[in-house]
Amino acid sequence: SQAQHTLAACERAQEPVALLLCDIDHFKQVNDTHGHAVGDQVLQATAKIMTQNMRAGDLLARWGGEEFLALLPSTSPSAALEAAERIREAVEAFTLRVSDTNTQVRVTLSFGVSSVRCLDDLLAATARADQALYASKDNGRNRVTLAEDQ
């Protein structure tokens, strides 16, 4: 996969890969209030904004329900925090205008950020990012949290 290739290249170059795990805050409420078609539009708009605020070599994938996972090759933890904050601010500033209605939907993101140096550590880095994501949610949502080991 492209992710494995990216991780292997960074491992050979001994460069870190940042892992951003994010969740759309209160997404169930969007679906419950506006319906799943609007929820799908929110997911698509969020992915587009995230991609627009990432570099050409960065990878973005939907990780499940309303979660996204981004791999940022050759990115230090501090640069990853800056990237996540930039994405968070861009999504927060965006208003989705639902086609054929006057409905406007705004969402925010919570992030967990970790770093990985080799392919073998990817699952552990994902678990650390997930813990940091939950810390973001526990501390009020709409924020970026760096995993403790970083």
Which residues are covered by each model-predicted region?
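A structural signal for short, well-ordered beta-strand segments
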Residues: C22, F68, L109-V113
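Residue-level recognition of strand-loop junctions within catalytic nucleotide-signaling folds
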Residues: D32, L72-T75, E92, V116-R117
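Catalytic core regions of nucleotide second-messenger enzymes
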Residues: R62, V91-L109
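Catalytic-core segments of nucleotide cyclases and related cyclic-nucleotide turnover enzymes
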Residues: L81-A84, S114-Q150
